[in-house]
Amino acid sequence: MIKEAIFHKSDVPYAYPLNENQLKIVLRTAVFDVDRVYVLYKDRYDWLGKFKIKPMVLTHTNELFDYYETTLELNKKFVYFFYLVSDGGEKLYYTEAGFYKKRPENHFWGFFHYPYIGEKDVFFAPEWTSDCMVYQIFPERFNNGDKSNDPENVKPWGEKPTADSFFGGDLQGIIDKIDYLKDLGINAIYLTPIFLSHSTHKYDTTDYYTIDPHFGDTQKARELVQKCHDNGIKVIFDAVFNHCGYDFFAFQDVIKNGKKSKYWDWFNIYEWPIKTHPKPSYEAFADTVWRMPKLMTKNPEVQKYLLEVAEYWIKEVDIDGWRLDVANEIDHHFWRKFREVVKAAKPEAIIVGEVWHDASPWLRGDQFDSVMNYPFRNAVVDFFAKRKISASRFNTMITEQLMRHMDSVNRVMFNLIGSHDTERFLTLANGMVARMKLALVFQFTFVGIPYIYYGDEVGMVGDYDPDCRRCMIWEEEKQNKSIFNFYKKLISIRRENEELKYGSFCTLYAIGRVFAFKREYKGKSIIVVLNNSSKQEVIFLNEVEGKEDILKMKELKRSGNLLYLQPNSAYILK
């Protein structure tokens, strides 16, 4: 056995409570290296009792590792345990202290321990997220519902955008399209920032308590949220707490008064008088973006101000959560306080961080509920849009993502294929709709929350920002109805099948450009098969007999467990 690959730690994601009496544990081994794994466990203070023994199940395999899992049923809230690992010949006992050829006895402090399951150690996402499908709106480009609040020099709707061009999108425009959103089938919207700012994107906030007048006002925001709620749609606002805008009152006071300003310590000022060029004389977003001075969230006064903002909009207009911009550049201490404030104001509010990389430090149950899942997007773009990786590599990428987090976190990850900060998926796929449809099937059948960037559902294209922020296409003759109807079908399939919302995930086939997996829940299963190639493929899969394709994207020919897959095809077998 390759001992160097065998790994466990009594912490997330290798050990975590599902409730006060169940502990999920995971053991990693080298791929194809082990044939049996058992866990031996008992209550930590049951000095005379015997160890219980339980076999573990191989749940995930990738190019490097196998992962074995089980759930321990506990009589008490504390447990200690160790593993028995076998490759058919050699047997090893694996403990926190290392490996043993003989079963260790009287080894209390050498075993793996989960000392106590506290009530707050159990992570539960907001209940409504289990059936959630999110639609992101960039308000300035979604719909112009009130021309009376348009900015000066507004551009004609549909003209190609620049970094600073305005088109007049507003909150009334979103209200006017609630029926459209309801017809599509989504049940949550996330709005990029809507607070006072001079920019089109509003990520340089001037006033956190004022809706930008080109979008509307507080009453209009309240109306939007209420009408969304009336139609079964949750509303998530965007919080930009890493930095403010150059015109933010506190920064302007520093510009005017220097060290005499009571807000001096709200920022990290290198030199005064303030300079913006050639490089800002203060810490700013991305080091050089002078319009966005970084806020010092270690400062108790800054914390108090921002936490009051977060609470205010929940209470004032009844929003259902916050998406947190540049969340990975703010200290964890602040986010723990943020969670306490938000959950006290509205326990079912969702907290979603913007983290482009491994977000596990923020997803332990004490900070965020979810993040925008850019690693998911990376894998989907590479496999489906660009076709530059194999199914085996794709499986490794998504398996690694699943194994970073608790199951309850994976189920609420915002699985996006594009956003206001990325190229449109259809652009990356060189306009090949077939590739996009395959990606969508995976997105809507994988573990997590499907996330739609406005306009993707009608076939919008666009390169990197600002081109990805084009005006929404409302002329039906210009919309791709094939893509739109495909979205609607996938949304319906996901909503009607519990396996896709709650089920476990297991890869069944990952060879060449064919990928197949199973979602299973309460004894029922759905098998998804994706042929991400331009030629017919023939594969053998167990468990497919008796199952019918509910997607009906392309004809499926079969002979027992042999499947004849059409080029660029997907099948959802139930």
From Swiss-Prot:
Cofactor(s) the protein needs: Ca(2+)
Site (Transition state stabilizer): D421
Top EC category: hydrolase
Domain of life: Bacteria
Catalytic activity, reaction form: cyclomaltodextrin + H2O = linear maltodextrin
Subunit structure, as described in the record: Monomer.
Entry function: Hydrolyzes cyclodextrins. Can also act on linear maltodextrins, with the exception of maltose.
Protein name from the UniProt record: Cyclomaltodextrinase
